[in-house]
Structure formats: C-alpha cells, structure tokens
Amino acid sequence: MIQRIFYPVGQGAFYSERHENCNIVYDCGSMSISKGRKVVSQRFSKEDIIDILFISHFDYDHISLIEDLKATVKEIRFVVMPLLHHNEKILLFNVSSI
C-alpha cells in the first residue's frame, strides 16, 4: 500500500510517499518557515530514513526546509536534482558556500 501525503506548509511544495520498503520526499520547502518546521517536526523523526529526496527546481519555496528535514531524520540516502548547466552548478556551489 502507498501512503501519499501533501503537507500543509502554505506557499511551497512538500510531499511524501511511504511505500512498504521505500520512503520518498518530493520537494521540501515553504515560504513560511515556521509552518514548515512544524510539519517536519510532527511528521518525521530520528528513526525515519528518506530513501529518495526529489528536488524539482531550486526555488526557495521548494528547498527551504531541506536542512530541517536532514537534521530531523536518521538519513537521506539519495537526492535527485534537476539537470543543471555548468553555470548553474557554479552558482549553486557558490551560494551554498555562503
């Protein structure tokens, strides 16, 4: 059985699917960090393993809660990101280093 959840984070995207042996998260963000953090803390725990985290694109309201999710769960095994051109990779690396 598949359990699909659309989390109430306001403007943003944060969904998950729980299969028998696989947990998947699609995007992980919200413009309202307080709403998003509440969802992360209520719906995930240190026992949870996210097998795959899919990121559709890098808008703030799709990625702003990734650090919170990472700090809350035991492990995120794989991250799937959109195809990036060379200049986008450089920009992403430089922004993440700040």
Describe these PLM feature segments.
Residues 1-44:
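Conserved beta-strand hairpin/beta-sheet module of binuclear metal-dependent hydrolase folds
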Residues 72-98:
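Flexible, acidic/histidine-containing loops and adjacent segments that form or flank the divalent-metal
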Residues 11, 58-63, 86-87:
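Active-site environment of divalent metal-dependent phosphoester hydrolases
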Residues 28-30, 58, 84:
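Structural motif
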Residues 35-81:
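Active-site metal-binding motif and surrounding structural segment of the metallo-beta-lactamase
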